[in-house]
A protein has these predicted regions:
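Short, structured patches in soluble enzyme cores that scaffold and shape functional sites
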Residues: 50, 137, 159-161, 168, ...
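Catalytic-pocket segment enriched in acidic/His residues
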Residues: 34-36, 217-339
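N-terminal export leaders
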Residues: 5-21
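Short acidic-glycine loop/turn motifs at beta-strand connectors
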Residues: 61-66, 191-193, 263-264, 328-330
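N-terminal non-catalytic cap/leader segment that marks the start of a structured domain
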Residues: 5, 12, 28-154, 323
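A generic local secondary-structure boundary/capping motif
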Residues: 34-37, 47-49, 122-124, 144-147, ...
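Structural signature of FAD isoalloxazine-binding scaffolds in flavoprotein oxidoreductases
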Residues: 148-167, 183, 320-329
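Secretory targeting signals
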Residues: 1-3
Length: 339
């Protein structure tokens, strides 16, 4: 017990000096530039990982020393910390995680808990969201390229837990059901505290962090079945997400460059500054109608450049073997292959 208490106090003392994020130690004053939910971690680049296929996926933190295996570090240092992303988001154990990370960065005993990033297998970034809310037509040029009216308020649809997929994973194309497969790079909001009818001015304080996602779509099912957006977008594995979630204090969500590449060719290139509904408005608007819970995620819309927006004679739909790479500034590059 004394050993545990010493470690907790030591972690608390160094926490003010640094937090691990993106491989760089960030002064606490910088980490506090953006608001974040009480009970949520801050100043961190988070991921879900495992060291081999026989293990369960668990929480990791990207640091300048490598990927910190949180469960391993907690055991070595005898300090409590949430072991999964879902535990972190739904149980408000962020301060405990920050203490563990700060302690591990300076404690020799924690050295075995740091591993090289290339040796880990990424898992689904968030695995148990109660809701996956998606915003459609949220970039003016994308609405125009698809022949849709520019919406006055966010257009909402949903995906399901079975859609979630991981970085460096595969998306199995249901070729018996559809033929017109398309990409959509998007910024994803991860909710950090319960949000119901929240004012727009406070909305960012409900975001735990942000990630890179792809709202993968079967266009023929979306448009040629009477406008069944859900069927075209909610097929299993159609929501790749990752590799990281940056905590909200480290990100200006309305000023991030985003791109999508197919087999190395850039197809989409824009900025979240071009979103019609900004991050505050989306969170506030959705919360008027749907109570958001910690761990829920929001796909925020895609910019122009999708296959659906091209002239019909130039629409070359995605096929097995294609490799997709989606990147958002600061949030990392999400990669997956079609099979």
């Amino acid at each position: 017990m004394k050993h545990t208490r010493r470690n907790v106090l030591k972690g608390a003392s160094v926490l003010a000096a640094a937090a691990a994020t993106g491989g760089i130690a960030v002064p606490q004053a910088e980490a506090n530039k953006q608001p974040y939910p009480k009970g949520m971690a801050h100043g961190l680049t988070l991921l879900t990982m495992r060291r081999n296929s026989s293990e369960d996926y668990r929480l990791g933190v990207k640091t300048e020393k490598g990927i910190l295996d949180v469960a391993a570090a907690a055991k070595l240092l005898r300090i409590y910390a949430p072991e999964t992303m879902d535990d972190l988001l739904q149980r408000e154990h962020g301060p405990a995680l920050n203490t563990l990370v700060a302690t591990a960065l300076t404690a020799a005993a924690a050295k075995p808990a740091f591993v090289k990033e290339e040796t880990v297998e990424y898992g689904p970034l968030v695995s148990r969201p109660a809701k996956i809310v998606c915003v459609g037509l949220n970039y003016r040029k994308h609405a125009q390229e698809t022949g849709a009216q520019v919406p006055k308020e966010p257009v909402l649809f949903n995906k399901y837990q079975t859609c979630l997929n991981r970085h460096n994973g595969t998306v199995k194309l249901p070729v018996d059901l559809a033929k017109k497969f398309d990409y959509e790079v998007e910024m994803v909001i991860v909710i950090g505290k319960e949000a119901s009818n929240v004012p727009e001015a406070d909305a960012l304080t409900y975001a735990a962090g942000y990630a890179t996602g792809n709202d993968f779509t079967a266009r023929d099912l979306q448009y040629e079945t009477g406008g069944q957006w859900m069927i075209g977008k909610a097929i299993d594995q159609f929501a790749p997400l990752g590799p990281y979630m940056l905590t909200a204090d480290l990100v200006d969500p309305d000023n991030l460059k985003l791109e999508c590449r197919v087999n190395g060719e850039t197809r989409q290139s824009s900025s979240t500054a071009d979103m019609i509904a900004n991050t505050r408005h989306m969170i506030s608007y959705i919360s008027r109608y749907i109570k958001l819970k910690p761990g829920d995620i929001i796909f925020t819309g895609t910019p122009e450049g999708v296959i659906q927006g091209k002239p019909k004679d130039k629409q070359v739909w995605l096929k097995p073997g294609d490799k997709i790479a989606c990147s958002l500034e600061k949030l990392g590059e999400l990669k997956f292959e079609l099979v």
